[in-house]
A protein has these predicted regions:
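PLP-dependent class I/II
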Residues: 6, 11-50, 60-93, 106, ...
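Charged, glycine-enriched surface loops/patches
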Residues: 57
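Short, surface-exposed loop/turn segments at secondary-structure junctions
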Residues: 98-103
Length: 429
């Protein structure tokens, strides 16, 4: 018999029949919607980076964009290479079903092969297209990888300071985010601190080199020592349960003379996550990849787990158009010179004004010591001069702030008097 047989078909009566709980019926009767409170909290509390960026947009509308110096976001001001536009024009000549149709979930075979062959040319490897899974950018690469290599209750180690969304993605995978403090002098990862953070529940370690937010590039020696420690831990574990090293590499191409070692050649249980948001200045197009190296003893099972994670998280396929762009532009160089020019102009001036910072070897961020212990208070004071910086607390380390110098050169130069005025104000306190 239908549950509706003896009920008038009002929404409240239907809800009461289908969901006979006091909490639901009370909320429904009041016109409230039952929602996932965890997701609500995550959405209601936006990241500090996005909050500052939104504030900057408001101020620009009020006083003019040229009067606001927004260093909050890693949004490249360097144009995408000309080859990108040419590739798009070429793709537009394709039949609509090819241009806009679904691709295979792991990506176009020719795109996956192009990525593998590019890596082989650069690092002397022998990867194949089957080792590459195309994604909707680095965020998707990381969330898929985390969900593929962890189980609820596991722990994932991050190197503090770290990109704040790591914690969000780790916790939403049902895991605990464990911070291992970087070396406070060099901001190289501290192998000793990682070792102290490892427990029987450790499933993975995330590294990010060149690093966001410090600009540090982890040396081969540092990575080799980390690999040795992880191998020692793995030797005491079930062989089917090694610690996975997740190498997050969206800034690999943006370096100032430093070597960025190829991590899979150092530690076999490595998965690489990559994005073209920074190297090709395509942050809004959302295209990247996951590499599960064929040298990883669990490669076949891991790739299936990555595919399963992408499926359950709702990532149908990477953007078809931009997979074709990647095929054409796979080895296009980044305009590192523009970022180097910005870096020099900013660091020379801040040093003169008395600021202390970490010399960045890569990426396009400057990690600067706040002029008072409370970085949040410092960044609020900086707003008086229309200087928008991200306080370090959300990166897992107090007392610093991050500047994204991927802005225009004019923004750098025009902001310098304000940085001097801010420093002068602190000297007079």
């Amino acid at each position: 018999m239908s549950v509706f047989t003896h009920l008038s078909l009002s929404p409240i009566n239907i809800a009461a029949a289908l969901f006979p709980t006091k909490a639901y019926n009370s909320a429904y009767a009041k016109g409230e919607q039952m929602i996932n409170e965890t997701m609500y909290a995550c959405g209601a509390e936006s990241s500090i980076i996005r909050e500052i960026f939104s504030y900057g947009l408001e101020r620009k509308a009020q006083i003019g964009a040229e009067n606001v110096f927004d260093f909050s976001l890693g949004n490249p001001s360097v144009p995408a290479p000309a080859a990108v536009a040419e590739s798009i024009k070429k793709a537009l000549e394709l039949p609509s079903d090819q241009l806009h149709g679904y691709t295979p979930a792991p990506g176009l075979p020719q795109c996956r092969t192009a990525v593998a062959e590019s890596l082989n040319r650069r690092f002397g490897t022998s990867y194949e297209g089957k080792d590459v899974f195309m994604t909707v950018g680095a965020a998707a690469s990381l969330t898929c990888t985390l969900n593929a290599v962890t189980n609820p209750g596991d722990e994932v180690i991050v190197i503090a300071p770290y990109f704040p969304e790591y914690r969000v993605w780790i916790e939403k995978a049902g895991c605990t985010c464990v911070e291992a403090l970087a070396d406070e002098d060099t901001f190289q990862l501290s192998v000793d601190n990682v070792l102290k953070a490892i427990t029987d529940k450790t499933a993975a370690v995330i590294i990010d080199s060149p690093n966001n937010p410090t600009g540090a590039v982890y040396t081969r020696d540092t990575l080799t020592r980390l690999a040795n420690v992880l191998c020692e831990v793995n030797a005491k574990r079930d062989p089917e349960n090694p610690i996975t090293l997740i190498s997050d590499e969206p800034y690999r191409e943006i370096v100032y003379g430093a070597e960025v070692p190829w991590v899979p050649s150092i530690y076999e249980h490595t998965i690489v996550c990559y994005s073209y948001s920074k190297s090709l200045s395509l942050p809004g197009e959302r295209v990247g990849w996951i590499l599960v190296p064929d040298t990883n003893p669990q490669a076949a099972r891991l790739m299936s787990a990555v595919a399963g994670a992408a499926r359950t998280l709702g990532f149908v396929c990477a953007p078809a158009l931009f997979q074709r762009v990647i095929i054409d532009c796979i080895d296009e160089p980044s305009d590192v010179e523009a970022y180097a020019r910005n870096r020099t102009a900013l660091t020379d001036a801040l040093a003169e004004y008395g600021y202390t910072y970490v010399e960045p070897d890569g990426a396009f961020y400057l990690w600067v010591k706040a002029l008072e212990p409370d970085a949040n208070a410092f960044c609020e004071r900086a707003k008086k001069y229309e200087l928008l910086a991200v306080p370090s607390d959300s990166f897992g380390m107090p007392g610093w702030f991050r500047l994204g110098y991927c802005v225009s050169y004019e923004t750098i130069v025009n902001s310098l008097p304000a940085w001097k005025q801010l420093a002068d104000e602190y000297r007079q306190k």
